[in-house]
Amino acid sequence: FDKNFKILRSKKLPKYSRGHGIHYNDFRSEFYVVCSYLDAILILDKKFKVKNKIQISKKINYEKAPHHHCNDCVSYKNSCYVSMFSKSGNWKLDSFDGAIMEIDLIQKKTVSTLAENLWMPHNPKIINGAFYVLDSLKGNLKGNNFNTIGSFPAFTRGLAHDGSFFYFVQSINRNFSKNIGINNITSI
């Protein structure tokens, strides 16, 4: 896109990949696309050619279905940080052990967990040298070593920062009924 949101270049992703989040890494001159149906990160060059794929886990190879609901990422130098609904891969069994996992881009594998105990996290960001993430279902903005720095009464995602203020979108979660009374979300 240009500054007026005119599409300058585009490319289709592989079939059944469901690209869900994207980040460009200046240090490595690569795009990272989080694909929730693949439980993987696609690495693309500047011309959008797929260079590689990094699996979040091997679970998809055994059961032929995604398990982690990976959705967004941010990268810094040789690491890519991916948010997901379930670190264990059991969100479909109502185990929302959400996390941000670090992927080593040289080794092409998951190497650590940056944050845990998140409920449907989205939009990990590095802002002024610090990590931030939306703990979406709880309606929390996390920062300052992943402490809650803001709480909002709706499902939150789409984090941006202009140097002074944070911006995000609030929406209704599709599965709200089972969460009534558990969190501070009031939108139904």
Language model: regions and residue ranges:
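Sequence-structural signature of mature extracellular/luminal beta-sheet repeat domains
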Residues: 1-188
